[in-house]
From Swiss-Prot:
Alphabetical UniProt keywords: ATP-binding, Kinase, Mitochondrion, Nucleotide-binding, Transferase, Transit peptide
Matches recorded under Pfam families: ADK
Any one Gene Ontology cellular component term annotated for this protein: cytoplasm
Spans annotated as NMP: 90-119
InterPro entries, sorted: Adenyl_kin_sub (IPR006259), Adenylat/UMP-CMP_kin (IPR000850), Adenylat_kinase_CS (IPR033690), P-loop_NTPase (IPR027417)
Protein name per the record: Probable adenylate kinase 1, chloroplastic
Lineage, top ranks: Eukaryota, Viridiplantae, Streptophyta, Embryophyta, Tracheophyta
EC number: 2.7.4.3
Enzyme class: transferase
Major location category of this protein: mitochondrion
Subcellular location field: Mitochondrion
GO molecular function: adenylate kinase activity; ATP binding
Organism: Oryza sativa subsp. japonica (Rice)
Amino acid sequence: MAAVQRLLRASASGGAAAAAAAARRRMSTAVAPEQTPAAAAFPFAAAAGRARQRVAEERNVQWVFLGCPGVGKGTYASRLSRLLGVPHIATGDLVRDELASSGPLSVQLAEIVNQGKLVSDEIIINLLSKRLKKGEEQGESGFILDGFPRTVKQAEILDGVTDIDMVVNLKLREDVLVEKCLGRRICGQCGKNFNLACIDVKGENGLPPIYMAPLLPPNNCMSKLITRADDTEEVVRNRLQIYNDMSQPVEGFYRQQGKLLEFDLPGGIPESWPKLLHVLNLEDQEEMKLATA
C-alpha cells in the first residue's frame, strides 16, 4: 500500500511541496519528444497516444475527468470505465457515501455541501486514500478519477504518487449547465440518477445550438424521485463560480504537461458519446465490446 502511504504523507504539512518536487524531478529527467505540427496544434495528442497504447497493452489506463458540476463527468467516466475495464472513482460519490454513513465527517460535510462550498483538500484526500486502499486490496488496476483533482495542490499530490496518462476536460455553456443541474433527480429507492430537464437551446452569439433529451425514470421510480439538497439555482450558480475560479490553474497545470484534452459537449449522450470515443480513438474498442456482448 505504498502509493496510499505516500498520498497520506503528502497530505500532511509540507507534503504537497515534496510531492510537487518529486514530480518535477521525474519530468526534468525525461527527454521531450520533438513536436510535429499536429502535436503543436493539439497539445493533448501525445498524451492521447500514450493512453491508447496503454489501453491496447494493459487495459489499466489512469485518466482524470475534469469539468463543472453537472457537466456529465460521472456519466462519461462510468461509460469509459465499463468499456475499458477499470474502476471509476468519483469523489462526489465518496462524499455522498460518507454523508449517508453518519461517520465522523458527515456533519461537517453536510454543512459544506448545503452551502454549495467545495470540500477541502484534507477531507477529499482522506476519502480518496481510503478508496484507493480498498481497491488495491481487491486487486484493482488503473482508474478513471472523476472530480479530483480540483486544485493545483491536489494535482501536485496526485502527480507525486502516480502517473496520469490523460486529463479530459468536459465543457458546456453555463446556461445549459444550470438548467441541467436543476433537472437532476435521484431515485430514493434504487439510487439511480435521472434528469427531467428537456434542454433545447438555440445557437446565438457564435455558440452552437444544444439539445439534450430528458433522462426519464421508469414508472416504478417516478414517485420516489428526490432532489439533491445542493441542486437549487443559488447553490448551483455559486458552485459554478467557485469551480470556474479554481479550475483554470488546474487546467493550466495539465496543459503545460501536454495531457489536457478539451472536449466541448455537442449535446446529450447520443450526440456526445460517439464523438468522445472518436477523439479518444476508442471506436474499435466499443465495436469489439458490442460484438462480444
